[in-house]
From Swiss-Prot:
InterPro entries: GIY-YIG_endonuc, GIY-YIG_endonuc_sf, UPF0213_domain. Belongs to the UPF0213 family. Residues 2-79 form the GIY-YIG domain. This is UPF0213 protein YsiG. It comes from Lactococcus lactis subsp. lactis (strain IL1403). Disulfide bonds: none annotated. Pfam families: GIY-YIG (PF01541).
Amino acid sequence: MNQYFTYILQCSDKTLYCGYTTDLEKRLATHNSGKGAKYTKTRLPVKLLASVDFDNKNDAMSCEWWFKHKLVRKQKLSLIKNDLIKEKFIEYLELKQKKNIHLK
């Protein structure tokens, strides 16, 4: 069974970049070689701040989307600092599921 990761990088300009992968070491090396995402190419070097593991690609991609679109920078930094990314993501999914149940 594959393992999937949502990861957060800090770029040289102190901005954050979030992505997903199956191989953290390889992906970090790819980013730092300038062959990663367009966003990180001009912000090298990057360093890994946090990663969260998942059993399936969909959860890793959903966590990436949630981190990018549902949180502001202050929230992101707090979750990273307190190692709460996965816990808060699961809470978000549970709340979302409850809302969907009540809407039906």
